[in-house]
Amino acid sequence: AREHALTAYEDTKETEDGFLHARSRAVLGRFYAKISDNDLALLHYSGALETLSKLDDPQSAVEVEMLLGQVLVDAGRREEAAEHYLSGLAVAEANDFRVLQGEILARLGEVEPDRSQRMNYLQRSLSLFRELGAVDRMREVQNSVHRAVMGK
C-alpha cells in the first residue's frame, strides 16, 4: 500500500493536475494515519488541503479537514482537531453538504470539552441525520449523546 501511494505521489508531483496530486497526498496521509505515524499523516493531509483550497474543491477540502481532525484527535491534540472540524463545518454549511455537516458535528461532539456545547453539536448532528434518514449514523450519535449525558 505504501509503495502504491508513494508511486502515485511521485507520478503526480510534477504534473499540472493539482487535484490528482492532492488526492495522492491524501492517500499517503491515510496510509500514515493507519500505521500511527501522525506527523507524516499531518504533513500529507495538510499539503492536500492546501492544494484543494486553491483548486476550489470544497467537498474534498471538507473531507481532508475531517481526516486532519481525526489524526489530531489520535495524537491527543483535541483543540487543534476542533479547529479543523470547525473550518470544515463552515465550508460544509456554505455549500449545503448536509451529510458532511452531520459527520463534522458528531466529531465536534466527541472533542468539545464543554458539556453544553458538546450536547449542542450532537443534537444538531442527530437532527441532520434524522432529516437525511441515516438511521445507522443516528444510532451512533445517540450513543454519543448518551455518553455526554452520563458525563463520559
Predicted stretch roles:
Residues 6-17, 46-57, 86-97, 126-134:
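Amphipathic alpha-helical segments of tetratricopeptide repeats
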Residues 15, 28, 35, 55, ...:
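Structural motif corresponding to the intra-repeat A-B loop/turn of tetratricopeptide repeats
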Residues 34-39, 46, 56-86, 90-93:
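Alpha-helical adaptor scaffolds
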